[in-house]
Amino acid sequence: MKHLRLLGMESEREALLKAMQDMECVEISSIDGSEEALKSGFAKPDDKALMSAQEASRAYRTALASLDRFAPEKKGMFRKRQGVSRAAFFSAESEENARTAAETINKDTRRLGEIESERTKNEALRATLAPWLTVDAPLGGADGALAVFFGTAGLNVTDDALKALADSLDGLLTWQQASSDRSLRYLLVMCHGSVKERALSALRDLGFSTVSFRGMTGTAKENDKALAENLAALEKERQEIEQRIAGLGGKREALLEASDRAAIALRREKAKSRLVGTDKVFLLEGWLPADRCAALEKTLEPFTCAIETREPTEDEYPQVPVQLKNNKLTRPLNMVTEMYSLPAYGTLDPNPLMAPFFILFYGIMMADMGYGLLMMIASVIISKKYRPKGTSGELFSLLGLCGISTFIMGALTGGFFGDFLTQLVAIVSPGTVFALPKLFDPLDDLTMILIGSMALGMVQIVTGMAISLIEKCKRKKFLDAFFEEITWWIVFIGIALLALGKGAAVLYVGCALVLLGPIVQGKGWGKLTGVFGSLYNHVTGYFGDILSYTRLMALMLAGSVIAQVFNMLAAMPGNVIAFIIISMLGNAMNFGLNLLGCYVHDLRLQCLEFFNKFYVDGGKPFRPMTLDTEYVDLQ
């Protein structure tokens, strides 16, 4: 990775950034506070363009969400990405059509929100009016000589209590019950204006609470009718708007393209916000792969700019982004590495070393020709038809590679959906014994498979130790390399020779070196405690790591047994059709469980047992300005 610094003309900034984005190899970083003298007079650009790009991207996403709601697209698990030429993708006509459609859809969507708000408000008002529908008095009350109160009182406020109140006011008060429920009486109280205050005070003493109908005139029934008519009009308008939005379903492809264009523009504006400049020039700093420097310089030849590239200093390593360089075989493993953590800059890319182990181990655990065929077919069909990119593309590429390994290991163990063919032949032709040729049987050769699993684990552990040895030697940590790796190799060789009956001399030498290591490397009392700590940690660590690889045998055995059990159950009716249906259902469940289970266990072996020996994590992902798209395949 190279550090890039570029000084260019402000008038060419937009075109230059588009050229960089088209190359997809430059990550623009924020200008730090160093070299203030150089940067004096430079300022950050305003964020108006960034906010506009964010708004445009949000508008297209909102429009697409509305289409998904009112004009849902029939689609399966995966959406096919339509191929679009760059000329058509970036054309002004395409953008204008999509913008007009998005504005129309979003305007209608906002109106739907307003309609929903009005509907909720009107329904709440109708609920408030419901207890008063039998009352003919106007809700606005009365003025002058007559005072009118709408209100509620508890059920404990009886007619006798109200009659007593009316008597105390010389009969200048009367009331009418509009309705009641389980806890309240809804009362209309009328009195002469001269006793209004006395009546209201006495009513409150009884627990009477007034109800206000602000802004309403006429009776409750009249207002309820008006609200019902308004709700009907709103419902009609809502249906018309939804139909209008649904009628724009044909604009979906244009909106998908526009959403991708907006995302590309937004990435460019975010990068632009990290620049500094004046009204004449701008300054850009960032990172690009070393092998793209010449191509970048050639691309920028038409522009008036000065470019400087240099190797990063060791102090800059934590800030240097990491880009994994892989071929077709190792690229799918990016998703595994990124799920764990990218390697720190300046350290080793683990993918080429991990790929053969990951793919082989997955095949060992799955070990079935039928399952392998399904994985390969799914990988090819999805990759060709839907052209997934990014992590999804890596996932299906890895699925295909693991499918090949699964098929090969299945051929070695004679598994095709378990013993599907054996059981099928027995049903079709009773008395006929048929079995696929196999090198070994998971059920009969358990000991051999167990030893083989641990042997493969030992190979991967030693590989990790060898990588660690090389890296330590590069950093001139020769003592660490000798006592951490070479010493234990001597121990491993000694154990192997002892098991073969060749004596224990080499093992004794290895053990002596294990005890000597902490003494040579430790200080003070640490020499003594280090002997026991190192011995315990390494012995238990290596022993536990090697035992972890027995999961290769366990998952191979589990998958094989489950498949055979389902086939056995399916064969019980003795009917070919019933056998095929039951067997396929059982194998489908077994396949689904093993597909995920083998991945998880394989991932654990790589991340905990293998990476633990040499891997230095903490890398910062390389995020250049790109033309990555979500919905279309840019060609």
List the predicted regions and their residue ranges.
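Long, charged N-terminal accessory/stalk domains
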Residues: 1-354, 382, 389-392, 396
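Conserved, carboxylate-rich catalytic/transport cores that coordinate ions
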Residues: 1-2, 9-17, 21-28, 294-635
